[in-house]
Amino acid sequence: MLMPKKTKYSKMMKGRNRGYAVRGIKLNFGDYGIKAVEAGRINSNQIEAARIAMTRYVNREAKVWINVFPDKPLTKKPLQTRMGKGKTGVEEWVMNIKPGRIIFELTGVNEDVARRALELSMHKLPFKTKIVTRESENEIY
């Protein structure tokens, strides 16, 4: 499970997820990647499920890079609890994803295999995504 080893503060405000991504919008390592088309939140279980789906299809022949890390704590009150009484403990760790952010990168296999592996992992993510290549990465979201 992905989570930070240590944080300065244990809890964080919810915040807003507006605008487009500024960082992480180009392929750095791989030849193919998954780019977010809409905003959302991704947790460590979803990242791991997408990674497993991808690596199983390519039989561990390809090199996979994960470009996101869940570093924001998400708290949740138990069911049938009255309001007040403070903020509860951390339920899970998430990362806000903005449109245009590259989530996974892949290299080491041909294009057909890479596209199929990325499609399988796209189904595990909770927001719309698209496949980008080195040639198509400059397209608008």
From Swiss-Prot:
GO annotation, biological process: translation
Q: Which InterPro entries match?
A: Ribosomal_uL16, Ribosomal_uL16_bact-type, Ribosomal_uL16_dom, Ribosomal_uL16_sf
- Please tell me one Gene Ontology term that the record gives under cellular component: cytosolic large ribosomal subunit
Q: Which CDD domains does the record cross-reference, listed alphabetically?
A: Ribosomal_L16_L10e (cd01433)
Which Gene3D superfamilies does the UniProt record give? Ribosomal protein L10e/L16
What keywords does the record list, in alphabetical order?
A: Ribonucleoprotein, Ribosomal protein, RNA-binding, rRNA-binding, tRNA-binding
Q: Where are the transmembrane segments?
A: none
Recorded GO terms, molecular function? rRNA binding; structural constituent of ribosome; tRNA binding
NCBIfam families membership? rplP_bact
The entry sums up its family as follows: Belongs to the universal ribosomal protein uL16 family.
Q: What does this protein do?
A: Binds 23S rRNA and is also seen to make contacts with the A and possibly P site tRNAs.
This protein's assembly is summarised as: Part of the 50S ribosomal subunit.
> What is the protein name for this chain?
Large ribosomal subunit protein uL16
From which organism does this entry originate? Answer: Campylobacter hominis (strain ATCC BAA-381 / DSM 21671 / CCUG 45161 / LMG 19568 / NCTC 13146 / CH001A)
